Amino acid sequence: MSGRVVSVLRYLLAFALVGVVGWGLQPLRLHLQQKERNAGLLLPAPEFDKTDALAQQLAWFSLGGLRTFAAEMLCVDATNAWLLQDWPRAHRRWSQITTLCPRRVNYWIRAARDMAKNAVAWVGNDETLSTHEKAVRSNDYLDAAEAFLQEGIANNPGNALLWLELAAFDEDLARRTNFTRAVENYRKAVELGASPMYRRWEFYNLCRIRGREQEAWQLGRELYREERHRAPSLRCLLLVLQNKLNIPEESRFTPEQLFGTRERARKQLRAFLHNDLRFPTTGIRELLHDE
């Protein structure tokens, strides 16, 4: 028997096996689709670029009810795109992955981080790009990251992890910031079951917003009542806020109340004064000078 005939027979056998497996999985596929319909989770068939060979091949699996399998295969290629620093391809893959499995919160988070951190960092280090080109491309990837998170929340509005991720995106000082939205997102995440510790991050972002000092002061005093919230930054910010708001002497905290001793207060306040977290520092220099 010639080698060509053997090769043809092997292909025929492979197709036959695929057909048998597909036929065997048909009852399970129909059952799962019915469950998805009953739960209101059945999604439309994803659209793929006709020039994208891998996505086209995996489209058959997704149409057969194997969306998770297809998404995992695309995750492998997204990782390969990361290794090759091929960020347009990585963005395309994550868009396809999140379309296939919009209820998988981890996919949305990974997609956003890949764009906001990895892609933006690569653009910043690319010496072939001009300053203007770097700014434009970085902004495009940040837009993509934000879009992934917002679409993830739209598909999973009750998931606290996505709200936390968007809050962290909004407060990242290395990129563009939106402290007002970060406050709301941390608040929403806690309402949805995230750790109450994130109320402190709500407070930190409130302190960065001009005109909301009174709100920050009230929240800070409330948090200070609990030992677990008494971080050095919170103690320092309480001193700053009472200076900015001209809080009456009888309602103020003293450095000894907040830090235990004057020496500890000086140490913490010096460190706070020289941090780069864009917190207000009203009155700190004067207090240290008086010491």
Task: Describe the residue ranges of each PLM region.
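Short coil/linker segments at helix-helix boundaries
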Residues: 27-159, 164-191, 200-204, 208, ...
